[in-house]
Amino acid sequence: MHTKTIFTMLTVASAATALTACADPTTTTNPASSTTTTASSATSYDISSIPTVDDIAALVPYDVKKRGTLRNGASTGYAPAEYMDADGQTPIGYDIDINKALAQVMGLNAGETKHSEFPTIIPALGTKFDVGISSFTITTEREQQVNMVSYLNVGSAWGVATGNPKNFNPSDPCGATIAVQTGTAQEEYAATLSDECVAAGKGKITVMPHELQTDIATKLIGGQYDATLADSTVIGYTSTQSGGKIEQIGETFESAPQGIAIAKDDAQLTEAVQKAMQYLMDTGYLTDILATYGADNAALTTAELNPSVN
């Protein structure tokens, strides 16, 4: 969810905030320039134990099978989904591992991911890339352009230092000091929420933007902030990387499904990807991959093709 859009705001007291997180190429935010990496060491899931499923492998188009690789385009600036390793050249993240796992199920030699600026991924499907696995929120507009196979459900969440030492109340954040990542909708939302607090006669929210989640985590644990607001997967990943020193408080809200994008005219590859993803769901591999990044709660159980969305 590289960029996000705010819809009609609800009241401050409800805290059921109307924030939708979605990857949206119409924004001016450059997803590749706004990393959410929270650890310097590489994290990955070993896909070597995942078997090839012959019935699914038989569905793979000839050109993909002959090439032997499933080519994925991803904008690698969004941990834990897709980001660059410390070498600045190797894509890592759960979306990268998922692409490798799909290739394994489909009987291919490898799942390869290359960085691409977010708005360029969908136009390159069917030529440069076979799939786009890059935190694409499923929208009706995207489903008109490409086929979308659902696999995740991601929303926004509040995070606090474990034990909530600042007694942060997600139902009434007025007067709190909140850390957000620069350029996200959470930054926009926190500012809007602060205005609503003031209008309601309550204390303003002090919004502290940071380029890196590492900085947010350090200061949150150190007691400088009351809470942070980010994507639910980012909160889960930060909790894992901090050794449990950060935890989510309250429920994930305004969740939206994410999907794998495939060229609209490639029905054969679409079917292969959909069935391979369903296999990963049914066998627990998808959950295991996501758990490596603290994001297992985001896993869906049904790989729907072009599901109905609002």
Segments (PLM) and residue ranges:
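Bacterial signal peptide processing site
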Residues: 23-26
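C-terminal motif of bacterial Sec signal peptides marking the signal peptidase cleavage site
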Residues: 18-21
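Periplasmic-binding protein-like
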Residues: 152-160, 236, 240-278, 296-310
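Short helix-initiation/N-cap motifs at beta->coil->alpha
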Residues: 112-123, 165-166, 205-218, 256
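Bilobed "Venus flytrap"/periplasmic-binding protein-like clamshell domains
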Residues: 91-105, 136-138, 155-212, 227, ...
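Acidic, polar ligand-binding/catalytic clefts
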Residues: 111-172
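A ligand-binding cleft/hinge motif common to bilobed small-molecule-binding domains
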Residues: 136-143, 191-192, 221-255
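Extracytoplasmic small-molecule ligand-binding "clamshell" domains
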Residues: 38-132
